[in-house]
Amino acid sequence: MTNYGEIFEVWFDGANGGTGYYGGANEERRVDKKNYYDWPGTIEIVRELQPNAVIFGDAGPDVRWVGNEHGFAYPTTWSNLMRDSIYGGMPEYAKKYSSGQENGTHWVPAEADVSIRPGWYYHPYEDHKVRSLPELLDIYYNSIGRNSSLLLNFPVDKTGQIHENDVRQLNKLVAKVKEDFSRKIALSGSNLSASSENGEYIVDNLLQPEMETFWNPKSGELPATVTIDFGEEQTFNRFLVQENISLGQRVKSFALEIRNENGQWETLAKETTIGYKRILRLPDTKTSAVKFTIHDAKDSPVISHLAFFNAPKLLLAPTIARDKNGQVSFDLSEEGLQAFYSLDGSDPKSGGIAYKESFELLQPATLKAVSKDPITGEFSEPITIAFPLAKKKWKVMNPEKDASKLIDDDPSTNYTSKQNKASIDLGENQEISGFTYYPIQNRYMSGLIKDFEFYTSLDGKNWQKAVFGEFGNIANSPIEQQVEFE
């Protein structure tokens, strides 16, 4: 506590007891989670040695665990907590307390925590499993955008540094978040009106960036509404709203409406809590006016800020998968994008086939695809996949029920042979020049193939060895292995 400089946060994990070394003895222990630890004394030490640090734990006392390790807060997230009813490692904490309580006795805001990798510590075999940009964006919007702070873990590698793959993804996240909020809809020329105003706390205060200025309707007047007339059509897909939390968290439910082409109000979103910050990701919405309505609140609402943004599309190449039966499907990084592809390796940007639905591809082909933003006309970087002959006629001859997982082209499934071998009937004579092996991708791996022999047969009885070898670094780099016959 005294050799690290100033510490921002002291983090007390809820896990305790279990198997480990206790005073030199390697044994398993179970502890009374409620009374075993001297939390008052421990907190006193932190306050003395690091007075500016916040303390994290199930019960805080300053910030609390959000109740999962996915990095997501909840659609309803209160910063208040029944703190005195909770202790570290409490079995029912995640279900009962982690989203906070409307009438909680203490201010203990949520902190979402998640690792940028599958685990909290560094392992070389996870270097290719760093979270994708879409995953990281989901984490951001479902934590920061849901009245929570975010702790994003970066395991330190054996050099004492954060791995370059992790840094690359973090930089992408930072750049995309900045881009999302760079196109703010200017409200200075808009006409703002409110259902009521309380003295100096007028609706125009919403245009000020300071938290201390806010709009406050007259006491007891709910629903309370703010109407924003842009004066002309605007397009947005992000909505941000904040309460002045120095006066507490109050809003229990709110809605966002837009004025449609017929001049009628149409509901765009219905949500619950706001807190320090609530961000909604919305479909591309074009309108000339918006209505923000607070339907329920613990006390007269104090709204410090609201804003609209037109975030550019996350323009990534499609994620492409083909199943055992040769059915090819595309997954786009964001709604509203289009995809184009070719099956001969040619540039799909010009003359490519528009992807509408999954399609059958049985024969070998070089599929090249791009995503397109129809609004800007911009294309993503291309993705190229060399598909071999589909496995539609293949059959695994091993007797185990799950043997078919060996060839199902689903990276999330796996098969372990009790005989350390597998035989596959290709359904017909085929000319092959090699094979690929995709190792198990579970967090805790077993059954990795290190040494191998590969045989072929024309009748299933007489076998000839085609190739043998070793997957040298498979434990540290469990990526697809490609072997060519000589």
What are these regions (language model features)?
Residues 283-295, 486:
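Noncatalytic modules at the cell exterior or secretory-pathway interfaces
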Residues 357-365:
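Solvent-exposed segments in extracellular or luminal domains encompassing
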Residues 325-332:
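A short beta-strand segment in extracellular, disulfide-stabilized domains
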Residues 171-233, 242-250, 270, 276, ...:
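Disordered, acidic Ser/Thr/Pro-rich linker "stalks" and the adjacent N-terminal cap
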Residues 240, 291-293, 368-372:
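Extracellular recognition modules
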Residues 1-222, 228, 232, 240-242, ...:
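Mature catalytic domains of secreted/periplasmic carbohydrate-active enzymes
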Residues 298-300, 374-382:
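Short, exposed coil/turn segments at beta-strand boundaries within extracellular/luminal domains
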